[in-house]
Amino acid sequence: LDQLFWNADRTTVDKVQFDQRLGEAMARTQAWILDGNYGRTLEMRLERCTQVFFLDLPVEVCLESVRARRGTVRPDMPWVETEEDPEFMEYIQTFPQQQRPKILELREKYGEKPWVVLRSRGQMDAYLRGLDAGMAEAKREQR
């Protein structure tokens, strides 16, 4: 979603252009993964998705991850972030109080969708290992 929202010069697109880019991105293919919060468009994405992964990680883990990514080239950002963004760090710190309740409300509303809630890096790793094992098993069955 950051690729849709941000320009390379660190300016943002307006809401209309962002919504258009988002709609086009979701319409381009039958299978997609959209990463990010962008709460204003969360419900639109929930309406169209078939699976939800909610990474409900502790604030400190999120802050550490942001700090670790600083100075690295990322495919999800049109520039390399070299400095800590105080506004973004504040957003992360207040996420559990301000954004998480909205996500939980939408989880109730879209309860028919399968939700996977992962609350730690260990749970994320275990989930991915399970996917790898399942894919390996499926390949063996195809032979």
In which residue ranges do the predicted regions lie?
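Glycine-rich phosphate-binding loop used to anchor ATP phosphates in small-molecule kinases
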Residues: 20-60, 96
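Conserved beta-strand termini and adjacent loop/short-helix elements that scaffold enzyme active sites
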Residues: 1, 36, 118-120
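NTP-dependent small-molecule kinase module
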Residues: 94-143
